[in-house]
Protein backbone atom coordinates (compact mmCIF):
# COMPACT_ATOMS: atom_id res chain seq x y z
CA UNK A 1 0.00 0.00 0.00
CA UNK A 2 1.25 3.46 -0.85
CA UNK A 3 1.50 5.48 2.33
CA UNK A 4 0.23 9.02 2.61
CA UNK A 5 2.96 11.38 1.51
CA UNK A 6 4.91 12.37 4.60
CA UNK A 7 5.07 15.92 3.37
CA UNK A 8 3.54 17.63 0.36
CA UNK A 9 5.80 19.20 -2.25
CA UNK A 10 5.93 22.97 -2.05
CA UNK A 11 4.43 24.84 -5.01
CA UNK A 12 6.95 26.89 -7.01
CA UNK A 13 9.77 24.66 -5.74
CA UNK A 14 8.44 21.44 -7.28
CA UNK A 15 10.54 19.64 -9.85
CA UNK A 16 8.35 19.24 -13.00
CA UNK A 17 9.41 15.56 -13.08
CA UNK A 18 7.31 14.92 -9.94
CA UNK A 19 4.17 16.62 -11.25
CA UNK A 20 1.32 14.66 -12.82
CA UNK A 21 -1.57 16.57 -14.39
CA UNK A 22 -4.62 14.46 -15.15
CA UNK A 23 -8.38 14.67 -15.43
CA UNK A 24 -11.23 12.23 -15.07
CA UNK A 25 -13.50 11.87 -18.09
CA UNK A 26 -16.67 9.81 -18.18
CA UNK A 27 -20.31 9.75 -19.18
CA UNK A 28 -22.74 11.52 -16.84
CA UNK A 29 -23.43 9.46 -13.68
CA UNK A 30 -20.51 7.05 -14.02
CA UNK A 31 -19.10 8.18 -10.69
CA UNK A 32 -16.40 10.77 -11.51
CA UNK A 33 -17.07 13.00 -8.52
CA UNK A 34 -17.31 10.07 -6.07
CA UNK A 35 -13.96 8.72 -7.29
CA UNK A 36 -12.51 12.22 -6.89
CA UNK A 37 -13.83 12.22 -3.28
CA UNK A 38 -11.98 8.97 -2.51
CA UNK A 39 -8.77 10.36 -4.00
CA UNK A 40 -9.05 13.49 -1.85
CA UNK A 41 -9.52 11.32 1.21
CA UNK A 42 -6.76 8.82 0.46
CA UNK A 43 -4.18 11.48 -0.27
CA UNK A 44 -5.10 13.13 3.03
CA UNK A 45 -5.97 16.48 1.45
CA UNK A 46 -9.42 16.44 3.02
CA UNK A 47 -9.71 14.86 6.46
CA UNK A 48 -12.52 12.41 7.17
CA UNK A 49 -14.34 14.89 9.37
CA UNK A 50 -14.84 17.61 6.75
CA UNK A 51 -15.44 15.09 3.95
CA UNK A 52 -18.85 15.16 2.28
CA UNK A 53 -20.17 13.50 -0.85
CA UNK A 54 -19.27 15.24 -4.13
CA UNK A 55 -16.86 17.48 -2.25
CA UNK A 56 -15.82 19.34 -5.38
CA UNK A 57 -19.34 20.16 -6.57
CA UNK A 58 -19.77 23.52 -4.90
CA UNK A 59 -22.96 24.88 -6.43
CA UNK A 60 -26.32 24.01 -4.83
CA UNK A 61 -27.66 23.04 -8.23
CA UNK A 62 -24.74 20.66 -8.80
CA UNK A 63 -25.33 18.98 -5.46
CA UNK A 64 -29.10 18.70 -5.89
CA UNK A 65 -29.06 17.32 -9.40
CA UNK A 66 -25.97 15.22 -8.76
CA UNK A 67 -24.20 16.62 -11.82
CA UNK A 68 -20.92 18.47 -12.24
CA UNK A 69 -21.14 21.77 -14.11
CA UNK A 70 -17.88 23.56 -13.34
CA UNK A 71 -14.50 21.84 -13.59
CA UNK A 72 -12.47 21.94 -10.38
CA UNK A 73 -8.68 21.65 -10.04
CA UNK A 74 -7.09 20.09 -6.93
CA UNK A 75 -3.47 19.41 -5.96
CA UNK A 76 -2.83 16.18 -4.02
CA UNK A 77 0.42 14.67 -2.68
CA UNK A 78 1.14 10.93 -3.25
CA UNK A 79 4.16 8.83 -2.40
CA UNK A 80 5.36 5.93 -4.55
CA UNK A 81 8.67 4.01 -4.24
CA UNK A 82 10.03 6.62 -1.85
CA UNK A 83 9.33 9.53 -4.20
CA UNK A 84 6.65 12.16 -3.51
CA UNK A 85 4.52 13.27 -6.45
CA UNK A 86 2.23 16.28 -6.78
CA UNK A 87 -0.94 15.12 -8.55
CA UNK A 88 -3.10 17.84 -10.08
CA UNK A 89 -6.55 16.43 -10.66
CA UNK A 90 -9.20 18.23 -12.67
CA UNK A 91 -12.77 16.98 -12.16
CA UNK A 92 -14.76 17.53 -15.36
CA UNK A 93 -18.48 17.54 -16.20
CA UNK A 94 -19.93 14.59 -18.11
CA UNK A 95 -22.92 16.22 -19.76
CA UNK A 96 -22.92 16.88 -23.51
CA UNK A 97 -23.79 20.57 -22.96
CA UNK A 98 -20.62 21.11 -20.97
CA UNK A 99 -18.17 19.42 -23.31
CA UNK A 100 -16.38 22.77 -23.76
CA UNK A 101 -15.56 22.64 -20.03
CA UNK A 102 -14.04 19.22 -20.67
CA UNK A 103 -12.01 20.38 -23.68
CA UNK A 104 -10.55 23.25 -21.64
CA UNK A 105 -9.56 20.92 -18.84
CA UNK A 106 -7.97 18.44 -21.25
CA UNK A 107 -5.75 21.18 -22.65
CA UNK A 108 -4.25 21.61 -19.16
CA UNK A 109 -3.43 17.89 -18.69
CA UNK A 110 -1.00 15.22 -19.90
CA UNK A 111 -3.18 12.28 -19.02
CA UNK A 112 -6.79 11.24 -18.52
CA UNK A 113 -8.58 8.58 -16.51
CA UNK A 114 -11.30 7.15 -18.74
CA UNK A 115 -13.94 6.02 -16.28
CA UNK A 116 -16.68 3.55 -17.23
CA UNK A 117 -19.48 2.27 -15.02
CA UNK A 118 -19.03 -1.51 -14.63
CA UNK A 119 -22.80 -1.96 -14.60
CA UNK A 120 -23.64 0.16 -17.65
CA UNK A 121 -20.67 -0.04 -19.98
CA UNK A 122 -19.55 2.43 -22.61
CA UNK A 123 -22.00 5.25 -23.39
CA UNK A 124 -22.20 8.04 -25.98
CA UNK A 125 -20.46 10.66 -23.88
CA UNK A 126 -17.66 8.22 -22.95
CA UNK A 127 -16.81 7.96 -26.64
CA UNK A 128 -17.09 11.71 -27.26
CA UNK A 129 -14.75 12.52 -24.36
CA UNK A 130 -12.34 9.76 -25.36
CA UNK A 131 -12.01 11.24 -28.86
CA UNK A 132 -11.40 14.68 -27.31
CA UNK A 133 -8.62 13.20 -25.15
CA UNK A 134 -7.04 11.41 -28.10
CA UNK A 135 -7.06 14.64 -30.13
CA UNK A 136 -5.07 16.24 -27.30
CA UNK A 137 -2.56 13.32 -27.31
CA UNK A 138 -3.25 12.44 -23.69
CA UNK A 139 -2.11 9.21 -22.05
CA UNK A 140 -5.28 7.29 -21.24
CA UNK A 141 -5.75 5.05 -18.19
CA UNK A 142 -8.87 2.86 -18.63
CA UNK A 143 -10.77 2.29 -15.37
CA UNK A 144 -13.97 0.45 -14.48
CA UNK A 145 -15.84 2.03 -11.58
CA UNK A 146 -18.63 0.73 -9.30
CA UNK A 147 -17.30 -2.85 -9.17
CA UNK A 148 -19.06 -3.22 -5.79
CA UNK A 149 -22.49 -3.13 -7.46
CA UNK A 150 -24.36 -6.45 -7.63
CA UNK A 151 -25.18 -5.73 -11.29
CA UNK A 152 -21.56 -5.04 -12.24
CA UNK A 153 -20.00 -7.19 -14.97
CA UNK A 154 -16.34 -6.08 -14.95
CA UNK A 155 -14.98 -8.86 -17.21
CA UNK A 156 -17.38 -8.09 -20.03
CA UNK A 157 -16.85 -4.33 -19.95
CA UNK A 158 -13.07 -4.63 -19.43
CA UNK A 159 -12.93 -6.52 -22.73
CA UNK A 160 -15.16 -3.88 -24.37
CA UNK A 161 -12.98 -1.04 -23.06
CA UNK A 162 -9.73 -2.76 -24.07
CA UNK A 163 -11.00 -3.32 -27.61
CA UNK A 164 -12.07 0.33 -27.80
CA UNK A 165 -8.71 1.88 -26.90
CA UNK A 166 -6.47 -1.04 -27.86
CA UNK A 167 -4.77 -3.03 -25.13
CA UNK A 168 -5.28 -5.97 -22.84
CA UNK A 169 -8.40 -6.41 -20.65
CA UNK A 170 -6.06 -7.11 -17.70
CA UNK A 171 -4.69 -3.54 -18.03
CA UNK A 172 -8.11 -2.12 -17.21
CA UNK A 173 -8.09 -1.10 -13.54
CA UNK A 174 -11.10 -1.99 -11.41
CA UNK A 175 -12.06 0.42 -8.67
CA UNK A 176 -14.99 1.38 -6.51
CA UNK A 177 -15.34 5.07 -5.80
CA UNK A 178 -17.80 4.24 -3.05
CA UNK A 179 -15.77 1.73 -1.01
CA UNK A 180 -12.33 2.96 -2.11
CA UNK A 181 -11.26 -0.45 -3.48
CA UNK A 182 -8.52 -0.16 -6.11
CA UNK A 183 -8.15 3.61 -5.77
CA UNK A 184 -4.59 3.32 -4.41
CA UNK A 185 -3.53 1.20 -7.39
CA UNK A 186 -5.07 3.85 -9.61
CA UNK A 187 -3.06 6.65 -7.94
CA UNK A 188 0.09 4.50 -8.33
CA UNK A 189 -0.72 3.95 -12.00
CA UNK A 190 -1.24 7.72 -12.48
CA UNK A 191 2.16 8.43 -10.89
CA UNK A 192 3.87 5.78 -13.05
CA UNK A 193 2.33 6.16 -16.48
CA UNK A 194 1.23 9.76 -16.99
CA UNK A 195 4.11 11.77 -18.49
CA UNK A 196 5.59 14.67 -16.53
CA UNK A 197 4.88 18.16 -17.90
CA UNK A 198 7.47 19.61 -20.26
CA UNK A 199 8.46 23.28 -20.17
CA UNK A 200 11.44 25.61 -19.96
CA UNK A 201 11.87 27.01 -16.41
CA UNK A 202 14.19 29.79 -17.63
CA UNK A 203 12.04 31.03 -20.51
CA UNK A 204 9.63 33.97 -20.32
CA UNK A 205 6.61 33.01 -18.21
CA UNK A 206 3.66 31.56 -20.11
CA UNK A 207 0.56 30.22 -18.37
CA UNK A 208 -2.69 29.10 -19.94
CA UNK A 209 -6.00 30.16 -18.41
CA UNK A 210 -8.30 27.15 -18.36
CA UNK A 211 -11.02 28.51 -16.11
CA UNK A 212 -12.03 31.64 -14.27
CA UNK A 213 -14.64 32.10 -11.57
CA UNK A 214 -16.01 35.18 -9.92
CA UNK A 215 -15.75 35.58 -6.18
CA UNK A 216 -17.93 38.30 -4.66
CA UNK A 217 -15.18 39.35 -2.23
CA UNK A 218 -11.96 38.83 -4.14
CA UNK A 219 -12.98 39.54 -7.71
CA UNK A 220 -11.99 37.18 -10.50
CA UNK A 221 -10.10 34.03 -9.55
CA UNK A 222 -8.21 32.77 -12.60
CA UNK A 223 -7.13 29.12 -12.82
CA UNK A 224 -3.94 28.64 -14.83
CA UNK A 225 -1.62 25.88 -15.95
CA UNK A 226 2.04 27.03 -16.10
CA UNK A 227 3.78 26.03 -19.33
CA UNK A 228 7.12 27.89 -19.16
CA UNK A 229 8.87 30.09 -16.61
CA UNK A 230 7.58 31.11 -13.20
CA UNK A 231 5.06 33.54 -11.70
CA UNK A 232 5.44 35.11 -8.25
CA UNK A 233 3.22 37.19 -5.95
CA UNK A 234 3.24 40.98 -6.48
CA UNK A 235 4.53 40.47 -10.02
CA UNK A 236 3.01 42.49 -12.86
CA UNK A 237 1.39 40.21 -15.42
CA UNK A 238 -0.01 40.84 -18.87
CA UNK A 239 -2.75 39.05 -20.82
CA UNK A 240 -1.54 38.34 -24.34
CA UNK A 241 -4.84 38.78 -26.19
CA UNK A 242 -6.00 42.00 -24.52
CA UNK A 243 -2.56 43.38 -23.51
CA UNK A 244 -4.12 44.35 -20.16
CA UNK A 245 -1.67 44.38 -17.24
CA UNK A 246 -2.48 43.53 -13.63
CA UNK A 247 -0.62 42.87 -10.42
CA UNK A 248 -0.82 39.42 -8.83
CA UNK A 249 -2.26 39.98 -5.35
CA UNK A 250 -2.30 36.30 -4.49
CA UNK A 251 -1.07 33.16 -6.21
CA UNK A 252 -1.45 29.61 -4.99
CA UNK A 253 -2.88 26.14 -5.46
CA UNK A 254 -6.25 24.59 -4.60
CA UNK A 255 -5.86 21.68 -2.31
CA UNK A 256 -8.90 21.72 -2.42
CA UNK A 257 -9.31 24.95 -0.44
CA UNK A 258 -7.26 27.84 -1.91
CA UNK A 259 -3.75 27.80 -0.39
CA UNK A 260 -1.48 30.79 -1.13
CA UNK A 261 2.10 29.95 -2.19
CA UNK A 262 5.36 31.66 -3.22
CA UNK A 263 4.45 31.31 -6.87
CA UNK A 264 3.93 28.68 -9.56
CA UNK A 265 6.60 26.89 -11.59
CA UNK A 266 6.63 24.84 -14.82
CA UNK A 267 3.80 22.32 -15.16
CA UNK A 268 1.93 23.44 -12.05
CA UNK A 269 -1.78 24.12 -11.90
CA UNK A 270 -2.95 26.90 -9.59
CA UNK A 271 -4.89 30.11 -9.28
CA UNK A 272 -4.17 33.85 -9.55
CA UNK A 273 -6.09 36.71 -7.96
CA UNK A 274 -5.48 40.14 -9.42
CA UNK A 275 -8.39 42.03 -7.88
CA UNK A 276 -9.95 42.53 -11.32
CA UNK A 277 -13.74 42.68 -11.17
CA UNK A 278 -14.39 42.03 -14.85
CA UNK A 279 -13.93 38.44 -15.93
CA UNK A 280 -13.63 39.43 -19.57
CA UNK A 281 -10.16 40.65 -18.62
CA UNK A 282 -9.11 37.04 -18.06
CA UNK A 283 -10.51 35.14 -20.99
CA UNK A 284 -10.39 31.39 -20.91
CA UNK A 285 -7.80 30.12 -23.38
CA UNK A 286 -5.71 33.29 -23.09
CA UNK A 287 -1.99 33.26 -22.24
CA UNK A 288 -0.68 35.01 -19.13
CA UNK A 289 2.88 36.34 -19.21
CA UNK A 290 4.95 38.77 -17.12
CA UNK A 291 4.83 42.46 -18.02
CA UNK A 292 8.57 42.89 -17.37
CA UNK A 293 9.64 40.07 -19.70
CA UNK A 294 6.71 39.20 -21.95
CA UNK A 295 6.64 36.05 -24.05
CA UNK A 296 6.51 36.63 -27.79
CA UNK A 297 4.30 33.73 -28.78
CA UNK A 298 0.89 33.00 -27.26
CA UNK A 299 -0.14 29.43 -26.55
CA UNK A 300 -2.58 27.88 -29.01
CA UNK A 301 -5.96 28.67 -27.41
CA UNK A 302 -9.24 26.88 -27.70
CA UNK A 303 -11.96 27.60 -30.11
CA UNK A 304 -14.60 29.73 -28.47
CA UNK A 305 -17.69 27.67 -27.65
CA UNK A 306 -20.45 28.55 -30.10
CA UNK A 307 -23.99 28.86 -28.76
CA UNK A 308 -26.37 26.33 -30.31
CA UNK A 309 -29.69 27.31 -28.74
CA UNK A 310 -31.18 30.78 -28.31
CA UNK A 311 -33.91 31.84 -25.96
CA UNK A 312 -35.29 35.15 -24.71
CA UNK A 313 -35.14 35.87 -20.97
CA UNK A 314 -37.54 38.55 -19.73
CA UNK A 315 -38.10 39.72 -16.15
CA UNK A 316 -41.73 39.30 -15.04
CA UNK A 317 -41.44 42.68 -13.34
CA UNK A 318 -40.07 45.21 -15.87
CA UNK A 319 -38.20 47.11 -13.15
CA UNK A 320 -35.95 44.06 -12.63
CA UNK A 321 -34.29 44.61 -16.03
CA UNK A 322 -31.09 46.27 -14.61
CA UNK A 323 -30.84 43.47 -12.03
CA UNK A 324 -31.12 40.88 -14.79
CA UNK A 325 -28.32 42.62 -16.71
CA UNK A 326 -26.07 42.60 -13.62
CA UNK A 327 -26.92 38.97 -12.91
CA UNK A 328 -26.05 37.92 -16.47
CA UNK A 329 -22.78 39.89 -16.26
CA UNK A 330 -21.89 38.00 -13.09
CA UNK A 331 -22.80 34.59 -14.53
CA UNK A 332 -20.77 35.38 -17.63
CA UNK A 333 -17.79 35.68 -15.28
CA UNK A 334 -17.83 32.01 -14.43
CA UNK A 335 -19.44 30.75 -17.63
CA UNK A 336 -17.50 31.68 -20.74
CA UNK A 337 -20.03 30.06 -23.06
CA UNK A 338 -22.99 32.27 -22.18
CA UNK A 339 -23.70 35.01 -24.74
CA UNK A 340 -26.46 37.58 -24.52
CA UNK A 341 -27.66 40.83 -26.05
CA UNK A 342 -30.57 43.11 -25.13
CA UNK A 343 -33.83 42.76 -27.05
CA UNK A 344 -37.35 44.08 -26.72
CA UNK A 345 -40.63 42.36 -27.32
CA UNK A 346 -43.97 44.10 -27.77
CA UNK A 347 -45.63 41.57 -25.51
CA UNK A 348 -42.93 41.00 -22.89
CA UNK A 349 -41.08 44.32 -22.69
CA UNK A 350 -37.31 44.56 -22.22
CA UNK A 351 -35.17 41.46 -21.87
CA UNK A 352 -32.17 39.61 -23.28
CA UNK A 353 -31.67 37.18 -26.12
CA UNK A 354 -29.29 34.60 -24.71
CA UNK A 355 -27.26 31.92 -26.47
CA UNK A 356 -26.67 28.58 -24.75
CA UNK A 357 -24.78 25.39 -25.54
CA UNK A 358 -27.86 23.23 -25.13
CA UNK A 359 -31.06 22.78 -23.18
CA UNK A 360 -29.43 21.69 -19.93
CA UNK A 361 -27.23 24.79 -20.06
CA UNK A 362 -30.34 26.96 -20.56
CA UNK A 363 -32.09 25.24 -17.65
CA UNK A 364 -29.08 25.61 -15.32
CA UNK A 365 -28.62 29.31 -16.17
CA UNK A 366 -32.31 30.16 -15.61
CA UNK A 367 -32.29 28.20 -12.35
CA UNK A 368 -29.15 30.01 -11.18
CA UNK A 369 -30.69 33.37 -12.07
CA UNK A 370 -33.76 32.65 -9.99
CA UNK A 371 -31.82 31.10 -7.08
CA UNK A 372 -28.70 33.15 -6.74
CA UNK A 373 -30.19 36.47 -7.81
CA UNK A 374 -33.85 36.04 -6.83
CA UNK A 375 -35.19 36.94 -10.31
CA UNK A 376 -38.58 35.84 -11.68
CA UNK A 377 -38.18 35.28 -15.41
CA UNK A 378 -40.16 34.28 -18.46
CA UNK A 379 -38.19 32.13 -20.89
CA UNK A 380 -39.37 32.09 -24.49
CA UNK A 381 -39.38 28.84 -26.45
CA UNK A 382 -35.80 27.94 -27.48
CA UNK A 383 -34.80 28.38 -31.13
CA UNK A 384 -31.68 27.88 -33.23
CA UNK A 385 -29.92 30.09 -35.81
CA UNK A 386 -31.51 30.20 -39.28
CA UNK A 387 -30.08 31.78 -42.44
CA UNK A 388 -32.91 33.21 -44.56
CA UNK A 389 -32.33 34.27 -48.17
CA UNK A 390 -34.97 36.56 -49.66
CA UNK A 391 -35.79 37.16 -53.33
CA UNK A 392 -33.40 40.11 -53.61
CA UNK A 393 -30.53 37.74 -52.66
CA UNK A 394 -30.14 39.27 -49.18
CA UNK A 395 -29.28 36.82 -46.42
CA UNK A 396 -30.55 37.48 -42.90
CA UNK A 397 -29.40 35.61 -39.79
CA UNK A 398 -32.40 34.87 -37.60
CA UNK A 399 -32.05 33.88 -33.93
CA UNK A 400 -35.52 35.07 -32.99
CA UNK A 401 -38.75 34.30 -34.89
CA UNK A 402 -39.66 38.03 -34.87
CA UNK A 403 -36.59 38.73 -37.07
CA UNK A 404 -37.90 36.39 -39.78
CA UNK A 405 -38.27 38.56 -42.91
CA UNK A 406 -41.63 38.93 -44.66
CA UNK A 407 -42.10 38.83 -48.44
CA UNK A 408 -40.86 36.20 -50.88
CA UNK A 409 -38.26 33.86 -49.43
CA UNK A 410 -36.00 31.81 -51.67
CA UNK A 411 -34.48 29.51 -49.06
CA UNK A 412 -34.11 28.94 -45.33
CA UNK A 413 -31.11 27.02 -44.05
CA UNK A 414 -30.99 25.51 -40.56
CA UNK A 415 -28.12 23.95 -38.58
CA UNK A 416 -27.80 20.17 -38.63
CA UNK A 417 -25.98 17.94 -36.19
CA UNK A 418 -24.52 14.46 -36.30
CA UNK A 419 -26.16 12.58 -33.46
CA UNK A 420 -24.86 9.33 -32.01
CA UNK A 421 -27.29 7.35 -29.87
CA UNK A 422 -26.14 4.38 -27.81
CA UNK A 423 -28.78 2.00 -26.52
CA UNK A 424 -29.54 -1.70 -25.93
CA UNK A 425 -30.30 -3.43 -29.23
CA UNK A 426 -33.98 -4.08 -28.33
CA UNK A 427 -34.74 -0.38 -28.69
CA UNK A 428 -33.35 0.18 -32.19
CA UNK A 429 -36.82 0.20 -33.78
CA UNK A 430 -38.28 2.81 -31.45
CA UNK A 431 -35.17 4.99 -31.74
CA UNK A 432 -35.30 4.92 -35.54
CA UNK A 433 -39.00 5.73 -35.49
CA UNK A 434 -38.37 8.72 -33.20
CA UNK A 435 -35.44 10.01 -35.28
CA UNK A 436 -37.39 9.71 -38.52
CA UNK A 437 -40.31 11.63 -37.06
CA UNK A 438 -37.77 14.40 -36.35
CA UNK A 439 -36.54 14.50 -39.97
CA UNK A 440 -33.44 12.44 -39.18
CA UNK A 441 -31.40 10.70 -41.89
CA UNK A 442 -29.74 7.42 -40.91
CA UNK A 443 -25.94 7.45 -41.35
CA UNK A 444 -25.17 4.01 -40.01
CA UNK A 445 -25.33 1.50 -37.18
CA UNK A 446 -22.63 -0.29 -35.27
CA UNK A 447 -22.82 -3.03 -32.65
CA UNK A 448 -20.56 -2.51 -29.62
CA UNK A 449 -20.46 -5.90 -27.95
CA UNK A 450 -23.39 -8.27 -28.35
CA UNK A 451 -26.17 -6.18 -26.84
CA UNK A 452 -25.39 -2.50 -27.42
CA UNK A 453 -25.87 -0.52 -30.62
CA UNK A 454 -24.61 2.85 -31.73
CA UNK A 455 -27.07 4.46 -34.17
CA UNK A 456 -25.85 7.52 -36.08
CA UNK A 457 -28.17 10.10 -37.62
CA UNK A 458 -27.94 13.57 -39.10
CA UNK A 459 -30.76 15.66 -37.71
CA UNK A 460 -31.80 19.30 -37.71
CA UNK A 461 -30.69 20.90 -34.44
CA UNK A 462 -34.09 22.60 -34.17
CA UNK A 463 -35.70 19.17 -33.75
CA UNK A 464 -33.30 18.14 -30.99
CA UNK A 465 -33.28 21.24 -28.79
CA UNK A 466 -36.79 20.90 -27.45
CA UNK A 467 -37.94 17.60 -26.07
CA UNK A 468 -36.03 15.07 -28.17
CA UNK A 469 -33.83 13.92 -25.29
CA UNK A 470 -36.82 13.47 -22.93
CA UNK A 471 -38.68 11.47 -25.57
CA UNK A 472 -35.61 9.36 -26.29
CA UNK A 473 -35.24 8.52 -22.60
CA UNK A 474 -38.91 7.67 -22.15
CA UNK A 475 -39.05 5.50 -25.28
CA UNK A 476 -35.96 3.51 -24.22
CA UNK A 477 -36.75 3.18 -20.49
CA UNK A 478 -33.89 5.57 -19.75
CA UNK A 479 -31.20 3.36 -21.31
CA UNK A 480 -30.30 5.43 -24.37
CA UNK A 481 -27.59 8.07 -24.26
CA UNK A 482 -27.15 10.84 -26.80
CA UNK A 483 -24.19 12.84 -28.04
CA UNK A 484 -24.20 15.31 -30.91
CA UNK A 485 -21.81 17.60 -32.75
CA UNK A 486 -22.45 20.35 -35.33
CA UNK A 487 -22.35 19.22 -38.96
CA UNK A 488 -23.01 22.34 -41.05
CA UNK A 489 -26.42 23.39 -42.31
CA UNK A 490 -29.07 22.36 -44.84
CA UNK A 491 -31.92 24.06 -46.71
CA UNK A 492 -35.36 23.12 -45.43
CA UNK A 493 -38.97 24.07 -46.04
CA UNK A 494 -39.40 26.16 -42.89
CA UNK A 495 -42.13 28.70 -42.24
CA UNK A 496 -42.90 31.19 -39.51
CA UNK A 497 -46.18 30.56 -37.71
CA UNK A 498 -47.69 33.69 -36.13
CA UNK A 499 -50.36 33.65 -33.44
CA UNK A 500 -52.94 36.42 -33.82
CA UNK A 501 -55.22 37.61 -31.03
CA UNK A 502 -58.17 39.48 -32.45
CA UNK A 503 -56.19 40.04 -35.64
CA UNK A 504 -53.11 41.38 -33.81
CA UNK A 505 -49.87 39.42 -33.84
CA UNK A 506 -48.36 38.45 -30.47
CA UNK A 507 -44.62 38.23 -31.12
CA UNK A 508 -43.81 36.08 -28.08
CA UNK A 509 -45.78 33.12 -29.48
CA UNK A 510 -44.32 33.10 -33.01
CA UNK A 511 -42.25 30.06 -33.97
CA UNK A 512 -40.26 28.83 -36.96
CA UNK A 513 -41.33 25.29 -37.80
CA UNK A 514 -41.23 22.86 -40.71
CA UNK A 515 -44.17 23.28 -43.08
CA UNK A 516 -45.41 19.73 -42.39
CA UNK A 517 -45.70 20.50 -38.67
CA UNK A 518 -47.05 24.04 -38.94
CA UNK A 519 -50.70 22.99 -38.72
CA UNK A 520 -50.09 20.85 -35.62
CA UNK A 521 -48.24 23.73 -33.94
CA UNK A 522 -51.05 26.17 -34.83
CA UNK A 523 -53.76 23.88 -33.43
CA UNK A 524 -51.73 23.25 -30.28
CA UNK A 525 -51.04 26.92 -29.52
CA UNK A 526 -54.52 28.21 -30.32
CA UNK A 527 -56.05 25.44 -28.18
CA UNK A 528 -53.72 26.19 -25.31
CA UNK A 529 -54.35 29.96 -25.42
CA UNK A 530 -58.10 29.39 -25.49
CA UNK A 531 -57.75 27.64 -22.14
CA UNK A 532 -55.43 30.27 -20.67
CA UNK A 533 -56.81 33.66 -21.70
CA UNK A 534 -59.75 34.77 -19.53
CA UNK A 535 -63.11 35.38 -21.23
CA UNK A 536 -63.83 38.96 -22.25
CA UNK A 537 -67.10 40.87 -22.73
CA UNK A 538 -66.81 40.15 -26.46
CA UNK A 539 -65.78 37.18 -28.58
CA UNK A 540 -62.00 36.89 -29.13
CA UNK A 541 -60.70 34.94 -32.13
CA UNK A 542 -57.28 33.27 -31.72
CA UNK A 543 -55.71 32.43 -35.08
CA UNK A 544 -52.52 30.78 -36.28
CA UNK A 545 -51.24 32.11 -39.59
CA UNK A 546 -48.42 31.56 -42.06
CA UNK A 547 -48.01 34.98 -43.68
CA UNK A 548 -51.56 36.05 -44.52
CA UNK A 549 -53.00 32.52 -44.63
CA UNK A 550 -54.89 31.41 -41.52
CA UNK A 551 -54.22 27.74 -40.75
CA UNK A 552 -56.03 27.25 -37.42
CA UNK A 553 -58.58 29.11 -35.30
CA UNK A 554 -60.17 28.94 -31.88
CA UNK A 555 -62.60 31.42 -30.31
CA UNK A 556 -63.00 32.51 -26.72
CA UNK A 557 -66.76 32.89 -26.21
CA UNK A 558 -68.01 36.23 -24.92
CA UNK A 559 -69.35 36.62 -21.40
CA UNK A 560 -72.87 37.99 -21.55
CA UNK A 561 -75.28 39.38 -19.07
CA UNK A 562 -78.74 37.90 -19.01
CA UNK A 563 -80.60 40.98 -20.28
CA UNK A 564 -83.94 39.14 -20.33
CA UNK A 565 -83.94 38.45 -16.60
CA UNK A 566 -86.11 41.50 -15.87
CA UNK A 567 -88.74 40.60 -18.51
CA UNK A 568 -91.33 38.42 -16.92
CA UNK A 569 -93.55 36.98 -19.62
CA UNK A 570 -94.19 39.89 -21.93
CA UNK A 571 -93.95 40.39 -25.66
CA UNK A 572 -91.28 38.70 -27.83
CA UNK A 573 -90.52 41.99 -29.61
CA UNK A 574 -89.51 43.56 -26.29
CA UNK A 575 -87.08 40.69 -25.67
CA UNK A 576 -85.75 40.91 -29.21
CA UNK A 577 -85.14 44.64 -28.82
CA UNK A 578 -83.05 44.06 -25.66
CA UNK A 579 -81.03 41.26 -27.30
CA UNK A 580 -80.36 43.38 -30.43
CA UNK A 581 -79.23 46.25 -28.20
CA UNK A 582 -76.82 43.94 -26.36
CA UNK A 583 -75.49 42.58 -29.66
CA UNK A 584 -74.91 46.13 -30.91
CA UNK A 585 -72.98 46.99 -27.73
CA UNK A 586 -70.79 43.88 -28.03
CA UNK A 587 -70.02 44.77 -31.65
CA UNK A 588 -68.94 48.28 -30.65
CA UNK A 589 -66.89 46.86 -27.78
CA UNK A 590 -65.17 44.43 -30.12
CA UNK A 591 -64.06 47.30 -32.36
CA UNK A 592 -62.43 49.27 -29.57
CA UNK A 593 -61.67 46.49 -27.06
CA UNK A 594 -58.17 45.17 -26.50
CA UNK A 595 -57.28 41.76 -25.15
CA UNK A 596 -54.85 41.79 -22.26
CA UNK A 597 -52.93 38.53 -22.09
CA UNK A 598 -52.25 37.89 -18.40
CA UNK A 599 -48.67 37.13 -17.34
CA UNK A 600 -49.65 33.63 -16.20
CA UNK A 601 -50.92 32.82 -19.69
CA UNK A 602 -47.56 33.79 -21.20
CA UNK A 603 -45.66 31.70 -18.72
CA UNK A 604 -47.92 28.68 -19.09
CA UNK A 605 -48.05 28.84 -22.90
CA UNK A 606 -44.29 29.24 -23.26
CA UNK A 607 -43.14 26.86 -20.58
CA UNK A 608 -45.76 24.19 -21.18
CA UNK A 609 -44.81 21.52 -23.68
CA UNK A 610 -45.19 24.01 -26.47
CA UNK A 611 -42.99 21.75 -28.53
CA UNK A 612 -45.27 18.75 -28.58
CA UNK A 613 -45.81 19.84 -32.19
CA UNK A 614 -43.78 16.92 -33.45
CA UNK A 615 -46.24 14.31 -32.32
Curated annotation (Swiss-Prot):
SMART domains in alphabetical order: EFG_C
Binding site for GTP: 29-34, 145-148
Ranges of residues in domain tr-type G: 17-198
Reaction(s) catalysed (UniProt annotation): GTP + H2O = GDP + phosphate + H(+)
Gene Ontology MF term list: GTP binding; GTPase activity; ribosome binding; translation elongation factor activity
Main location: membrane
Topological relation to the membrane, as annotated: Peripheral membrane protein
Keyword tags: Cell membrane, GTP-binding, Hydrolase, Membrane, Nucleotide-binding, Protein biosynthesis
One BP annotation, GO: positive regulation of translation
Cellular localisation: Cell membrane
EC number: 3.6.5.n1
Pfam families assigned to the protein according to its UniProt record, in alphabetical order: EFG_C, GTP_EFTU, GTP_EFTU_D2, LepA_C
GO cellular component: plasma membrane
Job of this protein: Required for accurate and efficient protein synthesis under certain stress conditions. May act as a fidelity factor of the translation reaction, by catalyzing a one-codon backward translocation of tRNAs on improperly translocated ribosomes. Back-translocation proceeds from a post-translocation (POST) complex to a pre-translocation (PRE) complex, thus giving elongation factor G a second chance to translocate the tRNAs correctly. Binds to ribosomes in a GTP-dependent manner.
Protein family membership: Belongs to the TRAFAC class translation factor GTPase superfamily. Classic translation factor GTPase family. LepA subfamily.
Protein name: Elongation factor 4
Name of the gene: lepA
